[in-house]
Amino acid sequence: MKNLLDLSYEELVAEVTSLGLERYRADQILDWVFNKKVNNFDEMTNLSKQHRALLKEHFSIPFLKLLDKKVSRIDGTTKFLWELEDGNTIESVMLFHPDRITACISTQVGCPVKCIFCATGMSGFVRNLTTGEIVAQILSMEREEKKKIGNVVYMGMGEPLLNYENTIKSIRILNHKKMGNIGIRRITISTVGIPDRIIQLAEEGLDVKLALSLHAPTNFKRDQLVPLNKKYSIEEILNAVKIYQRKTGNRVTIEYVLIRGINDEISDAKKLAEILKNMKIFVNLIPVNPTAEDLKKPSRERLLAFKRILLENGIEAEIRREKGSDIEAACGQLRLKRIKSTS
């Protein structure tokens, strides 16, 4: 039995017609799933009983099982703990803005990158999510909250470019006008920097936004913060980003988590401005959020000084407004709960 949420539009049409159904039946099914949030064929009343029975034999539509939900008293940010069909768990977040609703979704159970300031990496890595499991996060949040998500950031648990095929396919599904119908420029992939995949992304014809989690201006410091840097140096990553920009023309966001006494020195700001010189970028400065590690935020004065140096050197920069930290839903705070090994 196939997970219908794993299928692209073209694949679903092919599957439906191979069963002897008319092509337009695929559109009817997708309207039920993506617009009405119905995942039971028996409720799809514009399909005949015979067709419903046939579809039930061949497809499942597994939304996610909600284990827990926490709502921030500060800003309404909502964090969801989901159970997957194999018993593993992931977290997703819904963020509310005056003009939009953004979903922060996961691409892996755990994360193999193990950034020292990120709770997800502390829990280890179990497996990649399927395309359907990535898509189901959006549908399950929309059904639970009865609200339409307009923006998606691939910034939850996991490194999206280490689950490349499923990440890209899920984006095509979420963007398709008869499926998720989310504008492509409203979708952002965040990566610590996998050079060959960044270059491959430029060839996909997907005009998504790209965010690079850099966090340090030198390899010496980044090796300590992002262990994967020992495999892919800052120079290799930024070279890939430059190739990406030449091919797409798109501005790239640089994510920089600021940690007191580690990467927040004035010299760090000057070096960061130097390595990003002449690039079409925007820097998001993120004061570190509390996790199990004893890492401290810089002072407000230091944050402003860091930002000022970037601006003085022609680098656009802003200090990100924190959302959901009181429920551990902010940057770097998502973690695995009740891990069950699939081995």
Curated annotation (Swiss-Prot):
Function: Specifically methylates position 2 of adenine 2503 in 23S rRNA and position 2 of adenine 37 in tRNAs.
GO biological process, one term: rRNA base methylation
Entry binding sites for S-adenosyl-L-methionine: G158, E159, S190, S213, L214, H215, N289
HAMAP family xref list: RNA_methyltr_RlmN
Miscellaneous section: Reaction proceeds by a ping-pong mechanism involving intermediate methylation of a conserved cysteine residue.
GO MF annotations in UniProt: 4 iron, 4 sulfur cluster binding; metal ion binding; rRNA (adenine(2503)-C2-)-methyltransferase activity; rRNA binding; tRNA (adenine(37)-C2)-methyltransferase activity; tRNA binding
The Radical SAM core domain, residue ranges: 97-326
Alphabetical list of Pfam families matching this protein: Radical_SAM, RlmN_N
EC number, as in UniProt: 2.1.1.192
Details of cofactor binding: Binds 1 [4Fe-4S] cluster. The cluster is coordinated with 3 cysteines and an exchangeable S-adenosyl-L-methionine.
Keyword set, alphabetical order: 4Fe-4S, Cytoplasm, Disulfide bond, Iron, Iron-sulfur, Metal-binding, Methyltransferase, rRNA processing, S-adenosyl-L-methionine, Transferase, tRNA processing
Domain of life: Bacteria
Main location: cytoplasm
Active-site residues (renumbered): E91, C331
Catalytic activity: adenosine(2503) in 23S rRNA + 2 reduced [2Fe-2S]-[ferredoxin] + 2 S-adenosyl-L-methionine = 2-methyladenosine(2503) in 23S rRNA + 5'-deoxyadenosine + L-methionine + 2 oxidized [2Fe-2S]-[ferredoxin] + S-adenosyl-L-homocysteine; adenosine(37) in tRNA + 2 reduced [2Fe-2S]-[ferredoxin] + 2 S-adenosyl-L-methionine = 2-methyladenosine(37) in tRNA + 5'-deoxyadenosine + L-methionine + 2 oxidized [2Fe-2S]-[ferredoxin] + S-adenosyl-L-homocysteine
Annotated coiled-coil segments of the chain: none
Organism the protein comes from: Thermotoga sp. (strain RQ2)
Cofactor: [4Fe-4S] cluster
Protein name: Probable dual-specificity RNA methyltransferase RlmN
Cysteines paired by S-S bonds: C104-C331
Entries under CDD domains matching the protein: Radical_SAM
